[in-house]
Amino acid sequence: MQQNPHTHAAPGAARPVLRGVRRRLAAVTAAVAAVLVLGTLTGPGAQAADNPYERGPAPTESSIEALRGPYSVADTSVSSLAVTGFGGGTIYYPTSTSDGTFGAVVIAPGFTAYQSSIAWLGPRLASQGFVVFTIDTNTTLDQPDSRGRQLLAALDYLTGRSSVRGRIDSGRLGVMGHSMGGGGTLEAAKSRPSLQAAIPLTPWNLDKSWPEVSTPTLVVGADGDTIAPVASHAEPFYSGLPSSTDRAYLELNNATHFSPNTSNTTIAKYSISWLKRFIDDDTRYEQFLCPLPRPSLTIEEYRGNCPHGS
């Protein structure tokens, strides 16, 4: 009788084949796991295990210079009739709720100006993972000390009564402002040392020394500013901060007092880095602040203390 050579194989003959299949399955499983992990690390909700406040994927030069970050953004208007202590405004916030709460920033306009003058910062910062409130002041003629109080009143409304309060970590807050709003930013940081970040943009204030400020502060001046010249405003503000405070001075090149009123990549880049570093305690952004940025086509000068202590 003719025998079939493909039947009745020896008992151990299948083992190498099975081992090969198992190895291939293990390799595929590992590859899938790697893809899943990579997706987790690079998606909008990526967070490092040792810092629960990190939001968004690892930053790059291009990501912090982009017009929009990884988060989709919505906005809601706040009527001046619905609030006390400031003039209402617009809240910009990430639509995602899967990442937990976000830090928040309130931004005040300058003398005679409205929130529209700094509105570009709202979606730009919010898309990087912040709740941002651009406000109007009670009157356009309000002075820096009044604007400082209004920034704090807006923060209190944002965290206590606003429709997005559940999206905010009330322990991670910052302030920004332009011109007299920038002077108000320093006033707010002086009054409330629990603030995590302050960014005065081409600031104006009659008070030149700020020894009481312990909040990490980035002062932004402009080399062509004739309304608040850096020699009598931004530079002494920076120098008047305690050396123990995390501080930096960024002087824009070929810029004016009104440069913060239109979309500006340099302002956005370093504001995002400062807010991320100190509100989110996200050291992934330290690389853009330390070593100190060098003079360039957009930077006239940059000073600061590195590495940062906070």
Swiss-Prot record:
Optimum temperature is 25 degrees Celsius. The lineage of its organism: Bacteria, Bacillati, Actinomycetota, Actinomycetes, Kitasatosporales. The gene is bdeA. This is Bis(hydroxyethyl) terephthalate hydrolase. GO terms for molecular function: carboxylic ester hydrolase activity; hydrolase activity. Optimum pH is 7.0. Residues 1-48 form the signal peptide. Its EC number is 3.1.1.-. Disulfide bonds join 290-306. It comes from Streptomyces coelicolor (strain ATCC BAA-471 / A3(2) / M145). Keywords: Disulfide bond, Hydrolase, Secreted, Signal.
